[in-house]
């Protein structure tokens, strides 16, 4: 199964509470923190909600 590496590149300060909760649900905390997640519809949906805060790379 494919995986994606999600890295938080912008702060969640002054963001909507739903965006803050999504960042926390993905397992991201501080800026430049990264997490490897499965590439599925649920993960992609969460990433879409905070696309302006994160960078996404495919992991082989």
Swiss-Prot record:
Keywords: Ribonucleoprotein, Ribosomal protein. GO terms for cellular component: cytosolic large ribosomal subunit. It comes from Limosilactobacillus reuteri (strain DSM 20016). The keyword Hydrolase does not apply. The lineage of its organism: Bacteria, Bacillati, Bacillota, Bacilli, Lactobacillales. HAMAP family: Ribosomal_uL30_B. Disulfide bonds: none annotated. Gene3D superfamilies: Ribosomal protein L30, ferredoxin-like fold domain. It comes from the Bacteria. Part of the 50S ribosomal subunit. This is Large ribosomal subunit protein uL30.
């Amino acid at each position: 199964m494919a995986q994606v590496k999600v890295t938080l590149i912008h702060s969640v300060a002054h963001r909507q509470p739903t965006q803050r909760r999504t960042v926390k649900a993905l397992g991201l905390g501080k800026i430049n923190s990264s997490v490897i997640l499965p590439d599925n519809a649920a993960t992609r949906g969460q990433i879409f909600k905070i696309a302006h805060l994160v960078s996404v790379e495919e992991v082989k």
